[in-house]
Amino acid sequence: MKRSMYAGRVREEHIGQEITLKGWVGRRRDLGGLIFIDLRDREGIMQLVINPEKVSAEVMATAESLRSEFVIEVTGQVAAREQANDKLPTGAVELNVTALIVLNTAKTTPFEIKDGIEANDDTRLRYRYLDLRRPEMLENLKLRAKVTHSIRNYLDELEFIDVETPFLSKSTPEGARDYLVPSRVNKGHFYALPQSPQITKQLLMNAGFDRYYQIVKCFRDEDLRGDRQPEFTQVDLETSFLTEQEIQDITESLIARVMKETKGIEVTLPFPRMKYDDAMALYGSDKPDTRFDMLLQDLTEVVRGVDFKVFSEAPAVKAIVVTGAADNYSRKDIDKMTEVAKQYGAKGLAWVKVVDGELNGPVAKFLTGIQEELTTALVLEDKDLVLFVADTLEVANATLGALRGRIAKELGLIDNDKFNFLWVVDWPMFEWSEEEGRYMSAHHPFTLPQEETAHELEGDLAKVRAIAYDIVLNGYELGGGSLRINQKDLQERMFKALGFSTEEANDQFGFLLEAMDYGFPPHGGLAIGLDRFVMLLAGEENIREVIAFPKNNKATDPMTQAPSTVALKQLEELSLQVEEDETNKTN
């Protein structure tokens, strides 16, 4: 029989109709001779009723044999429930079954197919096809589909052209590690899976496409965390002849459309703008969460004269005030925060509490001479907790920024119903890498420097500023973009500033430099992390919850066992040899 509709879409207007439904058995209950079954499909749950007085003995026997996750087909008449279930969209109706067929049986599942399960992540990923049957997972992926549909429609309206770019590309330095693909035809040569379509989309601007977009898979071989995966999806945009502001306007309108169509939320435009230096100074992060206060405050000069060398001789002393939280944190709790501080490079964490108008705590005795000044500067009140970090400015900002977010979660200071978007602008072009011992691109080496600082490409690289912009949502980097270099001489200067010799630049990027000899237009763009965006819209804390088949934190797939070893013959065809891991060798 042909399915009449989805089980989750049956409503009161269907009462009296004979329909056929297909799906999975959720629960089976035997009550007073009747059998009740929750039939589940992708749209929801429908209650089935099998009455022995109204069905054949064969149907009754089949119903009695049903177990969870059996796949069945049922036909019957829609009727009103005697007692409606307000928790279900189908709760006012039920199906009086007249025919029942088992389409497939099922073993006992390793976890219940319901929301709020306690199975560990690897078990869920091992049986991902079962995990995806759970309503919340179905809803997450349906939300993702709505988001991509909304994005495509909007960009199509603005005459952006959807162009596919290659997955097999060239490995280039800078940024995260590439995933490499050996070439069988060209022995000893490797493709790289793209970390982004950055260069190819710029070349599309040179080709005259003017407005390009793509919802595209990208790949980065990096350490994983909750909002990262080795393969991820981004909404990639590039435009010609537009200003930084015009690109941001398009992006804001795109996000506003998505928020309205998928969540029914009206967002206020334009989004606030914050300079990079201000974000770091006030929030200790280049992706500030503005849903709560607790701003970082600079006390370097206030404490300069105190008889406490940790403060008086430190390059910077900064603090956050946790309002009214003195009783929330014991010394043991603060010791735990000190360990967190050390993870960010801080040597320790100083603190005081305001108790009956006086400062109490390990460093309070050093601050008695400036208590009034400190109280005024920090606007202190009774029961406040003050946390200090004395270190370099970078360490102080990073440490207090991390503690700020941690404390806000612990104290429930964050309104999870808020969506606070903002732009972080006026970025440094370069950032110092301790690991590499040199300056590296803060974004990528194709970013256009601000004209008034471009002369420092041959001078102090720390002073070069980029025409770059990141869009931030609730403490997450949602995406980033910039205007791009389109002049060959400036691009060559950029490569030189990054330590490339002329030969190295030509070897890695010669095709791009050559393209700049042929009328490369001014251009710029942006990329939005689709997985992260949907994660935030869905109220999840890990992008695995909005990806159908993700990897775990070891970049492996417990279901398929990828990555796996391959046959020796395959390696020989690629002229590859795998060295045995020293830790696996036996003596």
From Swiss-Prot:
GO CC aspect terms: cytoplasm
Reaction(s) this enzyme catalyzes, per UniProt: tRNA(Asp) + L-aspartate + ATP = L-aspartyl-tRNA(Asp) + AMP + diphosphate
Record: residues binding ATP: R220, D221, E222, Q229, E477, G529, L530, D531, R532
PROSITE patterns: AA_TRNA_LIGASE_II
GO molecular function: aspartate-tRNA ligase activity; ATP binding; catalytic activity, acting on a protein; nucleic acid binding; transferase activity
Binding site for L-aspartate: E174, R220, H443, R484
EC number: 6.1.1.12
Region (Aspartate): 198-201
Sections of the chain in a coiled coil: none
Function of the molecule: Catalyzes the attachment of L-aspartate to tRNA(Asp) in a two-step reaction: L-aspartate is first activated by ATP to form Asp-AMP and then transferred to the acceptor end of tRNA(Asp).
PANTHER family, sorted: ASPARTATE--TRNA LIGASE, MITOCHONDRIAL, ASPARTYL/LYSYL-TRNA SYNTHETASE
Protein name: Aspartate--tRNA ligase
